[in-house]
Amino acid sequence: MSSHIQIFDTTLRDGEQTPGVNFTFDERLRIALQLEKWGVDVIEAGFPASSTGSFKSVQAIAQTLTTTAVCGLARCKKSDIDAVYEATKDAAKPVVHVFIATSPIHLEHKLKMSQEDVLASIKEHVTYAKQLFDVVQFSPEDATRTELPFLVKCVQTAVDAGATVINIPDTVGYSYHDEYAHIFKTLTESVTSSNEIIYSAHCHDDLGMAVSNSLAAIEGGARRIEGTVNGIGERAGNAALEEVALALYVRNDHYGAQTALNLEETKKTSDLISRYAGIRVPRNKAIVGQNAFSHESGIHQDGVLKHRETYEIMTPQLVGVSTTELPLGKLSGKHAFSEKLKALGYNIDKEAQIDLFKQFKTIADKKKSVSDRDIHAIIQGSEHEHQALYKLETLQLQYVSSGLQSAVVVVKDKEGHIYQDSSIGTGSIVAIYNAVDRIFQKETELIDYRINSVTEGTDAQAEVHVNLLIEGKTVNGFGIDHDILQASCKAYVEAHAKFAAENVEKVGN
């Protein structure tokens, strides 16, 4: 019988530390709901003491989820712990995650504390947290660069003070398989408690070993894995939870352990995070990449056609990838479109389907066939526009002279107010973005601009992601359209709209 491995998702906390990623309030809530649908055991919803926005997001998630534990991060500070309590007190299963650094380099250069000071702080703050929470998780930050005897003391101190979950973070992705497994084995054998203690692994991917080390931790006695969807996170990212889960599923013969994830929701969860983070999943990404179930070699194709298991160790359907796609066309009606939405796992009311069907017909008139990926793109684009405080209404371009272009942009807010401005630039994109900047009356820096095609072919829809720096804050925008310039403008407007929404601003004019 397989043992249960808990999944602790930190996409909304550690994942959001990815450069250029800044989820909006609505996006955080939608992500949390999808993570609950995916079946994660715990969601680290944020760091409530860090900002008002983080506090409100954690609070909303705690008040919304019904089955998943909601966790907030806290330093060894009573004010941090109080903030987590206030944010999560309405959760079905509130959890506080208390941490302090323990490695020599952190003690000397960051904390300016002795080992005795750290042990005293752990005892004081875990004890305090236990007065407010039934479940307290403790993490010795930079554990893998901490002397093992001192690490044992830190963990024993936390357990004695009431912690029942101990997380061992490989904060800078420094450890390797055998070493990390040994740390867990040592702790499980050395630390004593009358309570059941769950050991948790938290790995970063700086040396490309986050998933491998997470699996090694299970071999060493860990019963919880922490990570993010698609492996997003600061620097090289975190352990990709979908990879950990499928490794346990496929190699259950070795690990003898399983998660409780609804694996068929894996691809949908990955796509949602990719879209909101503005980070495209690499085509060759394990489990959820576009090429994960593709076979180019003739020998491989022949083998798969004869028997799929010759070159596939798991089925696409297992993770929610459809392989029985029946494209729609310009003659497809509302019923066929509605049935396609159901087949793709969408539960959309009839009123919303009317607008989506109009968008579908517009694309169908321009393409020979409309694929499932096109349908996903239509819905994704519609969701973004529906959530946005402002959206693109019209865009007009005109050639001026000497290589200059003129752009007239019209934006509409949720109340129906119209904002219009124009500008010129050395090319269409520059002209468009100058005009949008004028509408929102903000000076911006374009950090990143990426175009991807939703499908193959010259008639494919364009998917544009932008990252902007506005008043020292990074925001991302996303736009989909059959026209690249329209998609580019939508993405830029969305980035501005996100900034305005987070800062409760109204545009000028």
Swiss-Prot record:
Q: What catalytic activity is recorded? A: 3-methyl-2-oxobutanoate + acetyl-CoA + H2O = (2S)-2-isopropylmalate + CoA + H(+)
| Location in or out of the cell | Cytoplasm
Domain (Pyruvate carboxyltransferase) spans: 5-267
**Manganese among keywords:** yes
> What Enzyme Commission number(s) apply to this enzyme?
2.3.3.13
On whether Metal-binding is a keyword of this UniProt record, the answer is yes
Principal subcellular localisation of the protein: cytoplasm
Question: Annotated pathway, please?
Answer: Amino-acid biosynthesis; L-leucine biosynthesis; L-leucine from 3-methyl-2-oxobutanoate: step 1/4
PANTHER family for this protein: 2-ISOPROPYLMALATE SYNTHASE 1, CHLOROPLASTIC-RELATED, HOMOCITRATE SYNTHASE-RELATED
Q: Which family does it belong to?
A: Belongs to the alpha-IPM synthase/homocitrate synthase family. LeuA type 1 subfamily.
Name listed for the protein in its UniProt record? 2-isopropylmalate synthase
Per the record, the gene is leuA
